[in-house]
């Protein structure tokens, strides 16, 4: 499709961050002259990542599902505050999710954002912290991307870098 349409830019949501990483890699490997722009996750007022799957949740499950965003925000804060041990961050996130009786973790992982290879330490490359959790029979995903080399101010500008807060 990129060969047929030949766009200057293509926009992909960060919510499916693995797809975003694969598309970026493909564009780079195949030397397409396309800027792939990651669009930030859109969240409901209570923090839950917007998804068509949210409609499958009962009111009780919907409340239980908030453990995902609580875990994401807690992990993100730990990393922003300087924690670089992936296991420490992941264990804290898992504890938040496991405290919710209706939640069943499929996975919670931290990987190198470019290669999708699991990491033990956050060093100089962007990392993706992604999760999939069942709430009842509904599988929900959420994530955050952290780029240690990003010095953004936290203001959202067009383009969005890996951290989701500044231009690429």
Stretch-by-stretch model annotation:
Residues 1-104, 113-115, 144:
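Nucleotidyltransferase catalytic core that binds NTPs
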Residues 92-168:
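Phosphate/ribose-recognition catalytic cores of enzymes acting on nucleotide-derived substrates
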